[in-house]
């Protein structure tokens, strides 16, 4: 977080500095003509930067300390803790802030000093009026931009595993950023040149003026537009991810902790698991409202070829599985759903997230073929926890007629038996922490008493879970993640607004004299407004279109990444994405309207 904030601050400050120095070029040139040497100008800029840096740091640290308690109270509210105006301001962080901003303002001094050394007085006086040079190798840059962006999109769409998605995400982001800058730098110029060659379109007063203005300074426009597109994409991606995580925590809790208290026995029979739960209920004095006891198998898929599945062998080195299977007997299925499948020896029922298996009529598991008798719904949701949804995006529940026969058919494979006993109690909030700690102690004690399981990671063990612990963990993690997401979104949004504002003001001053000349040669006020409107629309909504396209291609990868954090409802994430896009569009249009008014006012002066 610190690195992202520091980098964002540096980019915003550098962009604002380029705007200010561009508009001061004539002033500095005049000082030089009047007799000031470059060392005098550099000394003046150095002192101005030091004063500006000191005032900025003083105000920033002061405002940060002032609102520290309020921000911390907001964070406490998000993570579900009792709110209070407690200060978290730490004096030891001030030197870190001072060093970061000293580096940023030191870089400003170097950039401005190099600019003074490079330009002579005459160049300084004309620098603000000078157009940008036309770039070289525009077609090659355009093709390279399309290639890098296309490959970034391919990475985002092709990844299927949540863990792999995290590793691929940053490479995809870098490729898309590079492609965006190349396309804005070269691709827009190529398109404008093609429009210039189209006489029926170009030789109209409004079109000619707008296109000529854009071509005249396209290099600078390209950097600004690409920066707006990237910052807007960052806002959208961060907000969609953070809001989806916060909105999806209830679904995750329902999946991770369907009961108030539960015990899971790994490679332990259900009688032993039930005994641990009974001991807990006896010692805690809780009265049971509902109880669920389930025995099932689970295993990872090593290879999949259409409907043919291969399970990892027992002594094989495990890697990340392509899919996870949970296997239940039809008796357990009837217990959970109240429905009887009436399966014969070679028939199975199947619920699957695996796209390849959804339309299959048969299924082969380690060369044993079964007919898929029924395609099932998610019958364990809210009844048995399935944390494997975090590891893989596709998982399956298999219902077999007889568990013993199925185990015999896959003998020698890496399968694990799990027994789950979960209870809902009459008053789940009564001494919830004390009860949760008691259940943890009981499961640890019973695990140690299992034969040969006293050291290391046991092959057979018990694990405890409670809704109280799950809620505390989820609220803390999700609330903190949401807070960071909102914080970063605000930073990116401020960066976007500032870049848009400086861009409009800068271009307004540059265009003013040109539009005065056009009015003098016969362009009326209506034509001036139409020309300005078309140019501003092009400049502003092109980055927004790119940002929405970036988000559309990143959506699949974002959904995989937030799955690890617990967002298990795709429909909910889609609704959140639409709302975020709608709100961002309204904010963007508002900024567009306000800055366009400033642009028109400057041009019309």
Segments the model singles out, each with a brief description of its role:
Residues 51-195:
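Hydrophobic alpha-helical segments
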